[in-house]
Amino acid sequence: MLPRILYMNPIEHVIRQAPAIEAKLGYTFKDPQLLVLAFVHRSFINENREVNQHNERLEFLGDSVLGMLISDYLYCKLPKTPEGQLSYLRSRLVEASSCVHYIQSLDLSGYLLLGKGERMNDGRGRESILADLFEAIIGAIYLDGGLQAAKDFLFKNFHQHIEIILATPLRNWKALLQDYCQKNYQQTPLYQVLHESGPDHSKVFQISVWIQDRELGRGKGTSKKEAQQAAAADALSRVELP
């Protein structure tokens, strides 16, 4: 069941509830206006002309901060994992469904300020809005307290979920990509060696994967097989998989 969205005296309500919101976040804002702004959806200001800012700029910033923090974490935690597989794991951790999980686990969606039309929408748009809210909160914390504050918030609250995703066995990316291409293009993907370097006993291959004259992804590895898997994983990081 979707949460009930509060709409009577909404800005004042969020301001009054700031301590409760901060307790759930585990972070206290120096500038409370950033906290309030994170909860203002564009549809709300369309119906409340006295409000002239919404959370999309914070969402834009938070998206980049979240991606950087997850990339840094994966790079340090998985030093031997190829680039393509890192890209796939990052996409799993920052995709909309993960962001929705993050925000729902904090039980903050009831404070979100929406216009009447969005409040009445019980479709998929709500998930997108909740994911945007999470990114806006990340952006607000980053602006208020810096990168370390955003990092502390993310990993203090969601480290367990991140570890569960990382513990999921890595898939056969080539087989998955082949199935995807056959289903959507009725063709199998083609792999092309772009570059190889290093001595014979320590080669590094860079390979791209193509479908219908369109490059889908690239990957590196110490063998062609490993590089192909990395390229397939990179390609799959850009599409939705079940």
From Swiss-Prot:
Its main location: cytoplasm. Keywords: Cytoplasm, Endonuclease, Hydrolase, Magnesium, Metal-binding, mRNA processing, Nuclease, RNA-binding, rRNA processing, rRNA-binding, tRNA processing. Gene3D superfamilies: 3.30.160.20, Ribonuclease III domain. It is an enzyme of class 3 (hydrolase). InterPro entries: dsRBD_dom (IPR014720), RNase_III (IPR011907), RNase_III_dom (IPR000999), RNase_III_sf (IPR036389). The keyword Flavoprotein does not apply. Residues 18-146 form the RNase III domain. This is Ribonuclease 3. It comes from Protochlamydia amoebophila (strain UWE25).
